């Protein structure tokens, strides 16, 4: 942990990070507490358990809307950081991520014309590609829909989507 704190003070934190080149369609399951960043030009769907906390360790010296550097949360973050080396976790598709809080899987719209949310929790649908409608509401790539607990969604169109369910 001292190495992380020293690198933060010296402005060399990037030297401690592992960089993973990414390609379209890849997914990475990153457990909470893992230091991570999203590179320039990369679009992600970040699915996580409900939390009101995000600790910023480094912010590339960006300026906030108020004209001042954005707030960092170094001491709080140091208490929860997992410094073990990150190794990508593989899942057997359609599953692309799973933890005690949620499960995410990727599907083709043509293969699943209707989705039913269970009575305990909502489901989330994020479209990666294609266009069409969910319950007659149009969608395009990167649109997200939340289906309330106990309700259903009728899908029409084309493309792929990520389906996320809450684990109980």
Where do the model's predicted regions map?
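Ligand-binding loop in jelly-roll beta-barrel domains
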Residues: 33-53, 138-140, 149-168
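A structural signal for short secondary-structure junctions
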Residues: 98-101, 116-120, 126, 138-140, ...
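Glycine- and acidic-residue-biased ligand/ion/polar-headgroup-sensing regions
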Residues: 1-4, 108-136, 141
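Short acidic-glycine-tyrosine-enriched beta hairpin
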Residues: 17-29, 133-153
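A generic structural signal for well-ordered coil/turn residues at beta-strand boundaries
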Residues: 16, 24, 32, 41, ...
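His/acidic/aromatic-lined binding-pocket segments of jelly-roll/cupin-type domains
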Residues: 19-20, 27-28, 36, 115-117, ...
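C-terminal amphipathic alpha-helical segment
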Residues: 54-122
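An exposed, glycine/acidic-rich loop-and-rim segment of catalytic or binding clefts
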Residues: 8-18, 27-29, 35-83
């Amino acid at each position: 942990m001292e190495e992380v704190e020293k690198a933060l003070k010296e402005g060399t934190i990037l030297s401690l990070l592992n960089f993973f080149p990414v390609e379209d369609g890849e997914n990475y399951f990153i457990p909470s507490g893992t230091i991570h960043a999203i590179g320039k030009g990369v679009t992600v769907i970040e699915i996580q358990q409900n939390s009101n906390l995000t600790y910023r360790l480094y912010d590339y010296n960006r300026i906030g809307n108020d004209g001042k550097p954005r707030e960092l949360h170094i001491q709080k973050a140091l208490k929860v950081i997992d410094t073990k080396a990150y190794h990508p976790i593989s899942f057997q598709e359609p599953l692309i991520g799973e933890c005690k809080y949620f499960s995410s899987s990727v599907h083709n719209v043509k293969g699943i014309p209707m989705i039913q949310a269970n009575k305990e929790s909502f489901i989330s649908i994020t479209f990666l590609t294609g266009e069409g409608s969910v319950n007659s509401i149009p969608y395009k790539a990167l649109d997200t829909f939340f289906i309330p607990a106990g309700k259903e969604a009728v899908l029409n169109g084309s493309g792929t989507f990520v389906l996320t369910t809450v684990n109980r």
